[in-house]
Amino acid sequence: MFLRSLFRPPATEMPADAAAGPGAVRWRPLRRVLIWLRWFGLRALALMAVLVAIYALVNPPTTWTIVAASRSDPISTRDWVDIGDIAPVMRRSVVAAEDANFCLHWGFDMSEIRKVVASGSSRGASTITQQTAKNVFLWQGRSWPRKLLETIYTPLIEALWSKQRILEVYLNVAEFGPGIFGIGAAAREFYGVTPAQLTARQAARLAAVLPAPKSRDPNRASARSRAIADGAATIARDGRADCL
């Protein structure tokens, strides 16, 4: 009954003011368009919320990004890794690299956004939650429709998932190299270990490749990986890793 009411089209009866004169008749098509747009928008939002709620409990089997990548590279075997089976230093490293205030914000890091706007920089300020929304539900690339959907999905994810669930899903769908998706595949392919066995150095190097997984080598130290290792230690001390 609920689903039937959800998808039932809006009533299109003639407005009560149809007999009020030619002015009311002239606005009738616009009013009908607005009614249909509102009906579609509310149903789309409800479906998005249902999908987010499902993935709060069910692990996403694949993503559009993985499907697209499979056309150019073989996809390494992916085994889902629960958050408790990922080394704490790996969790801290990816947060230090991608979103140091992950435990403190509600999906959008407004302080970082203000810094970007004030500096006039073209760099992004996407949080891990925003990246999870993009990686799980949407597609890669820059476009206003995708950004709009990401902006809707992000607070839904924050409302319906725990911080640990967000990080777990992110680490299981993130790309760490050509055809290598998820922390389980990355730990196995690059270091021959399980995610629980990753060292601080390995975790920092894996986190360092995330902005450009097709061109960066997690077997090579870099200034970025050293900075991430320091950042992971810092957020462990100052409490910004408490939710992990």
Name every feature range the model reports, one short phrase each.
Residues 2-244:
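Juxtamembrane regions of bacterial inner-membrane/periplasmic proteins
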